[in-house]
Regions:
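Beta1/beta-strand and adjacent pyrophosphate-binding region of the FAD-binding site
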Residues: 1-13
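Conserved mid-domain beta->alpha element of the FAD-binding
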Residues: 10-23, 109, 157, 263-344
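Glycine-rich FAD pyrophosphate-binding loop
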Residues: 22-43
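Generic enzyme active-site microenvironment
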Residues: 30-31, 157, 201, 283
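Active-site-adjacent segment of FAD-dependent monooxygenases/related oxidoreductases
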Residues: 41-44, 49-116, 130
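Conserved FAD-binding catalytic core of PHBH/FMO-like flavoproteins
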Residues: 111, 118, 124-128, 133-263, ...
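C-terminal helical "tail/cap" subdomain of flavin- and related membrane-associated enzymes
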Residues: 295, 310-392
């Protein structure tokens, strides 16, 4: 079997790319190692930048999003008895962010792709890649107990951090940058109405975050050791710690409810470059991971594939590789800006092991500056809602 673009991975990056290519009349096949149910049930972040929402509208995929989403116009940051209110529309000429779970985005993209007759092969495990430096790459994969071969003009590696695409790039070609922070996030989902705003807290006991997934479902986090055992955290212990870190000691603001999911997420930053080797292009988590503090993972993946789709459209229409040749540099410029922002927010809001009194006071001074400076809040806001897409 042959296709123009073989997309490995049916996460947000691969699915958005498939729709962008379909719109331009470019053939593609999506190969996904996991089952459809597994992919659709993976709970991930739910903060969508304006550009991501706009793209879903352009592609005609926003009907359910418009019905079920929530719009956030601000975030709050609490520290030392003070509250920093960052109002997005005021600071970014009207922009907002949208709350709609990544798993819901994935469900919408898969349903629309299948309805349009777009081929997605689930439980299709890639076992080998060949000819990446030629003009007809090949993919070997297992499906229903048999090995299959797919040839293509281009491979889009959208298979995540643990996928097969990035390791297929020769070690002498690829450079990786990895930073693991000395803490993790203990996160829960609960059946309880969320507080009014997405709220971050820097407390002497550590970071905390109150967010929402729906009007009836809350998503909360507290900073813990990276190797923390979830079994050490009873529901009561979690709620008590969250109240303390959110300066809600009288328990009058945060509503407790039944916790139905609990887990520890590592906090790390990872970047691999170049994001291209021959006829294979990396996108999304296959090329980069950012700390969750800035809520950027899905949105950064969407930006990658928008740039890639423009390059592929130019290539298949005119034969020009000019945009594709710039793909990696264009994406990495944005990636490093997003890494910088996510690193800044992570450093600003967390307690680090061994923090000296000097470092703690500098951190508090930075928060106090944010409290008093509109320009500082504007910088946070414009990054939070999403930087403009650069011309490639």
């Amino acid at each position: 079997m042959h296709t123009q673009v073989a997309i490995i991975g049916a996460g947000p990056a691969g699915l958005f790319l498939s729709h962008l290519l379909f719109r331009e009349g470019i053939d593609c096949v999506v190969l996904e190692a996991r089952s459809r149910a597994y992919v659709e049930d993976r709970v991930r972040a739910g903060v969508l930048e304006q550009g991501t929402v706009d793209l879903m509208h352009e592609l005609g995929l926003d009907q359910r999003l418009r019905r079920e989403c929530m719009v956030d116009e601000a975030i709050d940051i609490r520290f030392g008895g003070k509250l920093i209110h960052v109002h997005f529309p005021e600071l970014t000429a009207g922009k907002v962010v949208t709350i709609y779970g990544q798993q819901e985005v994935v469900k919408d993209l898969i349903a629309a792709r299948i309805a349009a007759g777009g081929p997605i092969a689930f439980e299709a495990e890639v076992t080998g890649l060949g000819g990446l430096d030629g003009d007809k790459p090949t993919i070997r994969y297992m499906k229903d107990g048999s090995e299959h071969t797919l040839t293509c003009d281009v491979i889009a590696g959208c298979d995540g951090f643990h996928g097969v695409c990035r390791p297929a790039i020769p070690a002498g070609v690829l450079t990786t940058y990895d930073h693991i922070f000395p803490f993790g996030w203990l996160g829960i989902l609960s059946e309880s109405p969320p507080i009014r705003e997405m709220t971050y807290a820097n407390h002497d006991r550590g970071f905390a975050l109150c967010s929402r997934r729906s009007p009836k479902i809350s998503r909360h986090y507290v900073q813990v050791a990276p190797d923390e055992d979830v079994a050490n955290w009873s529901d009561d212990r979690f709620w008590n710690e969250l109240h303390i870190r959110m300066h809600d000691e009288n328990k009058s603001e945060i509503v407790e409810g039944r916790i139905f999911q609990k887990g520890v997420t590592p906090v790390r930053a990872f970047v691999a470059g170049p994001m291209r080797y021959g006829r294979m292009f990396l996108a999304g988590d296959a090329a980069h991971i950012v700390p969750p503090t800035g809520a950027k993972g899905l949105n950064l993946a969407v930006t990658d594939v928008r740039v890639l789709a423009r390059g592929l459209t130019e290539f298949f229409r005119s034969g020009s590789m000019a945009r594709l040749d710039r793909y990696s540099d264009t994406c990495l410029r944005r990636v490093w800006k997003v890494v910088r922002y996510s690193w800044h927010m992570t450093s600003l809001l967390h307690r680090f092991p061994g923090h000296s009194p000097f470092e703690r006071n500098v951190q508090l001074a930075e928060l106090d500056y944010l409290f008093t400076s509109r320009i500082a809040r504007q910088t946070i806001a414009e990054n939070y809602v999403g930087l403009p897409l650069e011309d490639d």
